[in-house]
Amino acid sequence: MINKSFSQTIVVPENQTAIFLGSGILPVFATPAMIALMENTAMKVLSDLPEGKTSVGISMNTNHLKACLVGEKIHCKATILSFEGRKYTFHVIATNENGDIIGEGTHERVIVDVEKFMSKLK
């Protein structure tokens, strides 16, 4: 499982800018949107879990290093660094079309039983 990875590419839409999401006043790819992309990419690494199981994010430690405009392509990759029991740690990285790193960090996810998890919230 270590080094298993998933990659995906998006084109920055208007609704993922800092001004749209309220995290800033500029029309650039928002930090919350970058983090959501990283989390989604890591989730997809674990897409082959048994029925009734899913992973939930529990930790994100990332740096947003470079701004991107609407219409730019962003490539995101998540790779399993380690796992212990139900907890998986990922390296996450996002780059622009020139290969410049726009964000990088680590993310942790835990495998849960969907039914048990949701029943605790009622």
Task: Give a label for each model feature.
Residues 1-29:
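Catalytic strand-loop segment that frames the active site of acyl-thioester-processing enzymes
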Residues 6-8, 56-60, 72-76, 86-88, ...:
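A generic structural signal for short beta-strands and their flanking turns/coil linkers
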Residues 9-13, 63, 108-110:
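Generic structural detector for well-ordered beta-strands
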Residues 31-35:
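Conserved N-terminal beta-strand and adjoining loop/helix that marks the start
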Residues 36-40, 44:
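Short, residue-level hotspots on alpha-helical faces of the histone-fold
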Residues 43-75:
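Hydrophobic beta-strand-centered segment that forms part of the acyl-chain substrate-binding groove
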Residues 70, 80-122:
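HotDog/MaoC-like acyl-thioester-processing domains
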